[in-house]
Amino acid sequence: MDIRRLTDRLGGLAFGGDYSPEQWDAEVWKQDDELMRRARVNLATVGVFSWALMEPEEGRYDFGWLDAHLDRLHAAGVAVDLATPTASPPPWFTLAHPDALPVGRDGTGLTHGSRDTYCLTAPAYRRAARRIAAALAERYGDHPALALWHVHNEYVTLCWCDHTAAAFRVWLRARHGSLDALNEAWGTAFWSQRYTSWEQVLPPRTSQWHRNPGQALDYSRFWSDEALAAYREQRDAIRAHSDRPVTTNLMMPGYQNLDLWALGREVDVVSVNHYPDAPGVDAAAHAAYDADRARSFAGGAPWLLMESGTNTVYAGDRTLAKEPGDVLRHSLAHIARGSEGALFFQWRQSRAGAETWHSAMVPHAGPDSRTFREVTATGEAVARLGELAGSTVRAEVAVLHDSAAWWAMNVDGLPSSELDYPTALRRAHRALWDAGRTVDFAHPEHDLSRYRVVIAPALFLLTDAGAENLRRYVADGGTLLVQHFTGIVDEHLHARLGGYPAAPLREALGIRVEEHRPLRQSERIALTDGSTATSWSESLRTEGAETVAAYTHGMLTGSPALTRHGFGSGHGWYLSTRLDDAAYAVLVGRLLTEAGVTPDLPGLPAGVEVVTRHAPDGRSWQLLINHGSEAAPLPQPAHDLLTDAPLSRLPAGGCAVLRAL
């Protein structure tokens, strides 16, 4: 695996961050060398936003300043993750190529003065990006400091310009083959939308009312493919001159412009940016959710936390500060779930510019600060964990995750505004995290045989192949929980006829949904098992399944709300409403118990997070984080790698890494 090349080069796990020496003078650079040694920094990301310096005018490159910094970092024992600067074109580029500026859905054109001011489909942009990637690789491909290539930064920008329209049409021709096929897929017989020439076809720009759902979904697919193509062009330009591994950073959690399963197959190292959006235990659960997603997109292989925050991060209308100890806790939370280190944005907090108040490893207050002391302590901790490099995480439970299903639930006109795919994903993961079980994410068409329990939350779009795969999983002995609004449409967003969900899945579940009945926003309904539910209900009938709980509400009184069906060697559960959190936790706990899924370290109190990493040679390590307010006794004393001492109680807020005997 290519990430092992990185950790071998570093001599252990990675620790460091995004480094922008061009923002500072020579005196600060000298301080940086010393402070990086103190913090045990061994990897610095360089060049992310440096296009204007690297190429001050079109076709003329100036790498002298970069030579000096890479040489200096190498002399200081710091390896480099060298970025292509293509996420932020310089002003000269947009003036020379105004057609490369992005255009919003409503037709508003943007200009330079910020970042991400480009259209991925603009030929001039793509040429310039390839050229600078090739120039960097030719110059630094075998530089002794170079450990990793970092293509671009956060592929999140969208565009609806004329270049995009032309590229979209090319993509649609390749996907559908003919206008007749496109018209059928998009259902253009409705609202008189039938296309009679390709020139009539546009991206889903702002229009009078709802966008065509098939058009919107295909645009999401197209844009993901376009971003992947842009990444591959730079990656291939680099590989022509360098054999070092290549990555690009996936933006977590809410950005879903890319099919992250597809991107995971294209990079040598899966790397992610993660900034928890809530304090306390919610932030810890959020970190686990994104770390488990990253590992899953890496195919279960080790991956890398490329960016996180040491302290304040932007959260809506304010910056929120982390609590003491969070730098270590959040770093270890990602390492526990497969990351081969912890890096931050950025090394030194900017004194000017748009992200002046974004936290950094060295804050405005300097090294004599709580933040830098925590950074140094975290660097020391990470340095002690080198033996974990190359180890992996195993899970017996999976939550199904499909980018197409996510995009499908963003289309206009769904039956309820409360239907939200990422919320459903996070809720399922949170229940499993609270129960102390390690979780993978899996695609509905993946091989699911290694999982004892699989949860399918809100898979609105489900292909025939996916439905058949889930049917087979249950028949072969798996426990499957399917939640409401799953299997409703096919890959074209065509509604399933004859009852929901898709026919193969109905067979495994032993039910047939006839009607959706969204609830009013403040409405709560009771079920016969004493639980309550909100948001959604369905009229369904059993076709072999047993009713576990029924509705006690209106016309659905007595109708099944939660069912269980023995099918083949397994069991298919169906939940037709949104249970309250406590009842949902009970349901998930029952599934885990019946399937024999146990915690990694039984006997610990609630609030102690435990994940096990396994080495190919049979060694294993248990990483513990106590999110509770009281010390937690361990089931038996163990040796803690962080303190190099025996440990019998984990303090409140404390962390430990135990080497299994």
List PLM regions with ranges.
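The substrate-binding groove and active-site-proximal loops of carbohydrate-active enzymes
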Residues: 14-25, 47-64, 111-130, 152-159, ...
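Conserved, mostly hydrophobic/aromatic
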Residues: 17, 36, 44, 73, ...
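Aromatic-lined substrate-binding rim segments of carbohydrate-active enzymes
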Residues: 30-38, 42-109, 137, 233-241, ...
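Carbohydrate-binding surfaces of carbohydrate-active enzymes
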Residues: 201, 275-661
